[in-house]
Amino acid sequence: MALSISIYFLLIFLSHFPSSHAEPFIGVNYGQVADNLPPPSETVKLLQSTSIQKVRLYGADPAIIKALAGTGVGIVIGAANGDVPSLASDPNAATQWINSNVLPFYPASKIMLITVGNEILMSNDPNLVNQLLPAMQNVQKALEAVSLGGKIKVSTVNSMTVLGSSDPPSSGSFAAGYQTGLKGILQFLSDTGSPFAINPYPFFAYQSDPRPETLAFCLFEPNAGRVDSKTGIKYTNMFDAQVDAVHSALKSMGFEKVEIVVAETGWASRGDANEVGASVDNAKAYNGNLIAHLRSMVGTPLMPGKPVDTYIFALYDENLKPGPSSERAFGLFKTDLSMVYDVGLAKSSSSSQTPSGKVTSSGWCVPKKGATNEELQASLDWACGHGIDCGAIQPGGACFEPNNVVSHAAYAMNMYFQKSPKQPTDCDFSKTATVTSQNPSYNNCVYPGGGGGGGGGGGGSKAVMNKYVSSDKVEKKNGATEPKVSSSLSFLLIFLSLIFHVYM
């Protein structure tokens, strides 16, 4: 019995170790306002060829939910705005909704969240707004009645217009007209451990302020940044600023601990003549840099160290959506399953390895002394979003440790430099980088480059200690550098040793 308990706690402990391939924070919206979509079975094959771990549906299409069974892909299903009145007024309607849309598929299909309505608070329909919370409560009770209350969460989705103030991010607050309705909803989310779902779109922020510096800020590209006048924090991208504004708004109402989920964000690859910024290049830059930013695990300035679960809009272009041309051009993939543009979502067997490190240049590109973490994070996001394989600095990769911005930026900057024509501007990164003759490789983390007398980065060369590895991460051993065993791993080894001595 004691051994079983020990193993149980060991499994819990091990579950907190990251997988080298799992990216549970990256999802995609699977819209269906189209008449040319591939069958669900083909879409599932497409998803399985990527690192996408979650899918958000706007409804509860049984064919899609069933097709996702056994894949491990997390699923968000939705009750439509038109369902809200009956769900609010009749608990039996909520029970029937769960019986029809959840029970036939769960747990084979990994349903995680039910969104009740989409942007209802902004609908200007007071009756619908008043019915939203009762509808959510009845859906929650229906889940609890079948013992799924703690396994499937219930929320609703909001647009950024729910905020009355968002600049600076630390002053974020909900619009006065929404606060009364939100108070009960936020209490419900807090009580049930459910997330606050929001739709931030830097794409629309740029359209309202189409300056070059705004575009760079929205696309995660190197820029001067924007300083929060209250906190002194410099923001280098619009996404973080918008998400932190939502966090501040939640905090202002006493719900700081309610988790934020980005239910939608994306960038149009084409648009009408008056839709500034809608292009393939900008869409690739935004989504690619966003994914790189999430993979960096840096979080946001007000929520550091934790990537926000984010659903990119959208999986496919939807040719029947009304409105301007951009509404039909947010897809990552065409309906023939080919990519509209590549943002690095395809699975790669080499994601946990470093390149061979052949001598390709006379030097390595590394951060300049004095560059700030904010500047380096922007450079890291930009490099990884422009065709660089940053798998080595993701969890499980050979260069993931030390897990800090400086080390990860050094690797990404150098990878970009080695793939470029190696002009001085290719190792500039807004004046935050420089070329060095000192090989920054360490242990099994190989930085391609070198040449001349500097010593290549190949496996047979003796790499000098990477000065971007912080002193608390390394110690010298026989002239080489070795990573210290992390406290978590030390605990694990001690734990296993105790089990061995007690039970063997």
From Swiss-Prot:
Carries keyword Cell division? no
Cell location: Secreted; Secreted, Cell wall
Pfam families with a match to the protein in the record: Glyco_hydro_17 (PF00332), X8 (PF07983)
Q: Which UniProt keywords apply?
A: Cell wall, Cell wall biogenesis/degradation, Disulfide bond, Glycosidase, Hydrolase, Secreted, Signal
Q: Tell me the disulfide pairings in this chain.
A: 365-427
Decide whether keyword Transcription regulation is in the record. Answer: no
Q: Which GO terms describe its cellular component?
A: extracellular region
EC class name:
hydrolase
Q: What are the BP-aspect GO terms?
A: carbohydrate metabolic process; cell wall organization
Question: How is the protein altered post-translationally, as described in the entry?
Answer: Contains two additional disulfide bonds.
Which residues are the active-site ones? Answer: 119 (proton donor), 264 (nucleophile)
The record's catalysed reaction(s) read: Hydrolysis of (1->3)-beta-D-glucosidic linkages in (1->3)-beta-D-glucans
Q: Where is the signal peptide?
A: 1-22
Record-level Gene Ontology MF annotations: glucan endo-1,3-beta-D-glucosidase activity
- So what EC number does this one have? 3.2.1.39
Main subcellular location of this protein, as a coarse class: secreted
**So what family is this one in?**
Belongs to the glycosyl hydrolase 17 family.
Q: What is this protein called?
A: Glucan endo-1,3-beta-glucosidase 7
